[in-house]
Amino acid sequence: MKTMKVTQIKSGAHRLKSHKACLMGLGLRRIGHTVEVEDTPSTRGMVNRINYMVKVEEA
């Protein structure tokens, strides 16, 4: 299955609870942290919701 690399580039502090939940759901903990996740509709939805806080690369 396809994967994508997601890197957190902005802090999760003082954000909406749903946006913090998306960060936790993707496994992102701090600025500069990168995770590799499967490219599924659910992960795409989380990434789209917090697109201003993350950078996405196709892996």
Curated annotation (Swiss-Prot):
GO terms for cellular component: cytosolic large ribosomal subunit. The keyword Ribonucleoprotein applies. Gene3D superfamilies: Ribosomal protein L30, ferredoxin-like fold domain. One of its GO terms (biological process) is translation. GO terms for molecular function: structural constituent of ribosome. Pfam families: Ribosomal_L30. Disulfide bonds: none annotated. Keywords: Ribonucleoprotein, Ribosomal protein. HAMAP family: Ribosomal_uL30_B. Part of the 50S ribosomal subunit. Belongs to the universal ribosomal protein uL30 family. PANTHER family: LARGE RIBOSOMAL SUBUNIT PROTEIN UL30M, MITOCHONDRIAL RIBOSOMAL PROTEIN L30. This is Large ribosomal subunit protein uL30. It comes from Psychrobacter sp. (strain PRwf-1).
